[in-house]
Amino acid sequence: MSSGETFRPTADFHPSLWRNHFLKGASDFKTVDHTATQERHEALKEEVRRMITDAEDKPVQKLRLIDEVQRLGVAYHFEKEIEDAIQKLCPIYIDSNRADLHTVSLHFRLLRQQGIKISCDVFEKFKDDEGRFKSSLINDVQGMLSLYEAAYMAVRGEHILDEAIAFTTTHLKSLVAQDHVTPKLAEQINHALYRPLRKTLPRLEARYFMSMINSTSDHLYNKTLLNFAKLDFNILLELHKEELNELTKWWKDLDFTTKLPYARDRLVELYFWDLGTYFEPQYAFGRKIMTQLNYILSIIDDTYDAYGTLEELSLFTEAVQRWNIEAVDMLPEYMKLIYRTLLDAFNEIEEDMAKQGRSHCVRYAKEENQKVIGAYSVQAKWFSEGYVPTIEEYMPIALTSCAYTFVITNSFLGMGDFATKEVFEWISNNPKVVKAASVICRLMDDMQGHEFEQKRGHVASAIECYTKQHGVSKEEAIKMFEEEVANAWKDINEELMMKPTVVARPLLGTILNLARAIDFIYKEDDGYTHSYLIKDQIASVLGDHVPF
């Protein structure tokens, strides 16, 4: 590079895998009578509702039905019925010495998922005199799977559930490795071991569970429920594709792909991320604004990480803090486009929110956006100076720059009356559940993305900060951060079982889903940057209809 050239640490990100895939032409809009479909949907829904409210004298059957309704992704239709059923099931079976491992585990998990902090002492009866889980349990594969799933509902200090994860993981892996289970059961075990239900995105689990039921001859699965779930999934699929069609038009009009070629072009991946946050039809507005704001922030992130000079970035940071269109004149040409797009997006959201009488909420998202970009600026300076901070100095800045408080705030903008002014004040004070989601985001991102980022030139991640400060290996640092992530999950579990909850349960469920999205994206690699790694899963929930 000649002395007159400007150094830009570009990353050579791969292009969009989807581009205009979801863009509809005039010929795609056909006049279809949806009346018959809706009538069938309503009829099946009422049948399922009756199933949930009936069979009061069959609690084990009721437990299984509720579990299937939730895993198939249709529980949002029956929230009151499920809540009533769970409350009635609270005192049943847990204290009974006759209840088997599967029943106790399923009951425990369903109650905790509903926010009821039932004691983990219910599993003590499955231990032997030496305090270990009984060896006889190893042959109860269904019970072992249920215990494994239940154990991920743990909070800090529940050592019996930590032991349960270790016990079930070891023996379930052994059963598969030694071919002691059928191929179908082995596939179910591997699916659970790779990602437990607590960490699974609802749409992906629904799609998997439908396929799993389809391929089994188990007559216990309810065909009415399955058909309702398939129909509901397909109806929502059309809605989600239409949302992506509109977002693709917005993306195409921006033409960032041509004008800002250094940045990751990940519109569909971001929509999928936001679909993981909430998929229900009433949150269509939320998905739209989340995708738009997160797409713009992703462009800004890459501008700070992979293109802008320190002088340019300082100007952009100042412009964002001013938040005034007049500040655009101080920016270089390529940044003017980004800045105008950012302000335009917020202005449009403010207008839409004004129609709901909630425009006052938008300022919280603006403030979080400013905090994120301020953190980007600090990290850009660190990189420019070759500075590696201590982990104590790094984490407060990095927890802001991971932008999950901003993302959570954006998601709440789309949740209507649940998200009051008091809720946004609560978020801005960084409560435990929000911090836990940010810890999961930052540390998983750093653990999976740091090698790619360091090769191209990037601010030090948590890995580099910790290894330099403490003189330990990368492997030791990762092990410690994995424990921190596990504890953050336990903090989320604890907050979702607080009585009374500080904010409405749907809001807490959104934070849980955002943590799940991180686990999906960053479990083995940086699936957002290298998005070909998650293309098949995106296609599974945004592709073809589920066949009947």
UniProtKB/Swiss-Prot annotation:
Reactions catalysed, as given in the entry: (2E,6E)-farnesyl diphosphate = (+)-valencene + diphosphate
Keywords: Lyase, Magnesium, Metal-binding
Xref: CDD domains: Terpene_cyclase_plant_C1
InterPro entries: Isoprenoid_synthase_dom_sf, Terpene_cyclase-like_1_C, Terpene_cyclase_plant_C1, Terpene_synth_N, Terpene_synth_N_sf, Terpene_synthase-like, Terpene_synthase_metal-bd, Terpenoid_cyclase/PrenylTrfase
Positions with a binding annotation for Mg(2+) 3: 445, 453
Binding site for Mg(2+) 2: 301, 305
Cofactor: Mg(2+); Mn(2+)
Superkingdom as given in the UniProt entry: Eukaryota
EC number: 4.2.3.73
SUPFAM superfamilies named in the record: Terpenoid cyclases/Protein prenyltransferases, Terpenoid synthases
Binding sites annotated in the UniProt record for Mg(2+) 1: 301, 305
GO biological process assignments: diterpenoid biosynthetic process; fruit ripening; response to ethylene
Induction: Induced by ethylene.
GO molecular function: magnesium ion binding; terpene synthase activity; valencene synthase activity
Motif (DDXXD motif): 301-305
Cofactor detail note: Binds 3 Mg(2+) or Mn(2+) ions per subunit.
UniProt function note: Sesquiterpene synthase involved in the biosynthesis of volatile compounds which contribute to fruit flavor and aroma. Mediates the conversion of (2E,6E)-farnesyl diphosphate (FPP) into (+)-valencene. No activity detected with geranyl diphosphate (GPP).
Annotated family: Belongs to the terpene synthase family. Tpsa subfamily.
Annotated domain remarks: The Asp-Asp-Xaa-Xaa-Asp/Glu (DDXXD/E) motif is important for the catalytic activity, presumably through binding to Mg(2+).
Name this protein carries in UniProt: Terpene synthase 1
Species the sequence originates in: Citrus sinensis (Sweet orange)
Lineage: Eukaryota, Viridiplantae, Streptophyta, Embryophyta, Tracheophyta
